[in-house]
From Swiss-Prot:
Residues 23-35 are annotated as: Complementarity-determining-1. Transmembrane segments: none annotated. This is Ig kappa chain V region AH80-5. It comes from Oryctolagus cuniculus. Residues 36-50 are annotated as: Framework-2. The keyword rRNA-binding does not apply. GO terms for biological process: adaptive immune response. Residues 1-22 are annotated as: Framework-1. GO terms for cellular component: immunoglobulin complex. Disulfide bonds: none annotated. This chain was obtained from antibody to type III pneumococci and was isolated from the serum of a single rabbit. Residues 94-103 are annotated as: Complementarity-determining-3.
Length: 114
């Protein structure tokens, strides 16, 4: 499975909204086996959203700011009310087709202006 993630970088002012798109070359398992991961500078990636839209437990930032949506081959992560703390954070999608067929998107870096 091949995951195409866009954009590779997004520059937004504080308080704005970021939309990240992820497209699978073929439908993921059960149409919803798509995860989003969040990687802050100097840290390993952490699970943010599972099953396309289910927020992971223990998300430290305001969980209401993160929303996952989509099904089949098209998925979206929306981050609202971007904060300074979001700067240089990279988000990755991961599609799951089977136990030995899963892949990450190329990542999207959030650049915060101001």
């Amino acid at each position: 499975i091949v995951m195409t993630q866009t954009p590779s970088s997004k520059s937004v002012p504080v308080g704005d909204t970021v939309t990240i798109n992820c497209q699978a070359a073929q439908s993921v398992y059960s149409n919803n086996r798509l995860s989003w991961f969040q990687q802050k500078p100097g840290q390993p990636p952490k699970g943010l959203i599972y099953y396309a839209s289910t927020l992971a437990s223990g998300v430290q930032q305001d969980p209401s700011r993160f929303k996952g949506s989509g099904s089949g081959t098209q998925f979206t992560l929306t981050i609202s009310d971007v904060q300074c703390b979001b700067a240089a954070t990279v988000y990755y999608c991961q599609g799951y087709k089977s136990s030995d067929t899963r892949a990450f998107g190329g990542g999207t870096e959030v650049v915060v202006k101001g």
